From Swiss-Prot:
The keyword Repeat does not apply. InterPro entries: GreA/GreB_C_sf (IPR036953), TF_GreA/GreB_CS (IPR018151), Tscrpt_elong_fac_GreA (IPR006359), Tscrpt_elong_fac_GreA/B (IPR028624), Tscrpt_elong_fac_GreA/B_C (IPR001437), Tscrpt_elong_fac_GreA/B_fam (IPR023459), Tscrpt_elong_fac_GreA/B_N (IPR022691), Tscrpt_elong_fac_GreA/B_N_sf (IPR036805). It comes from Psychrobacter cryohalolentis (strain ATCC BAA-1226 / DSM 17306 / VKM B-2378 / K5). GO terms for biological process: DNA-templated transcription elongation; regulation of DNA-templated transcription elongation. This is Transcription elongation factor GreA. HAMAP family: GreA_GreB (MF_00105). The lineage of its organism: Bacteria, Pseudomonadati, Pseudomonadota, Gammaproteobacteria, Moraxellales. The keyword Transcription applies. Belongs to the GreA/GreB family. Disulfide bonds: none annotated.
Amino acid sequence: MQRYPMTPQGHAALEAELKQLKSIDRPRITASIAEAREHGDLKENAEYHAAREQQGFCEARIRDIEAKLGGAQVIDPTTLPKDGRVIFGVSVVIENMDTEEEKQYKIVGDDEADFKAGKISVNSPIARGLIGKSEGDEARIETPKGVVEYEIMKVIYD
């Protein structure tokens, strides 16, 4: 069984999305399909086909979330030893050694990642290059733009 690392907040967000899909979206789509059926010929009924397609997307997302919750490995970074190492769930301040630009990222699960909000996936090239390193260490990270060198300025266990 595949394991899906996630923060407690990410786990709660997936549970909320699953509840929304099952209790609100699924019944709404079912009602739309029933209403579209009443309009007659299903072969040329665009509303019916659109609702069926929407139903397929909804059911696929439900299955995806259920699989992820079933294999969830909830990691609360506040309970981990605070030894200055970069691990899942921490925020890390890094400095690009060429440009001296500082950025802060929180390392989270795949479903929680939001680059614009400063949350990067544990499976991203940046996170993979930082995990296991400590404050003051340098990391050479292969990015789509080439190799970038960063210095780890601070690790925050939040």
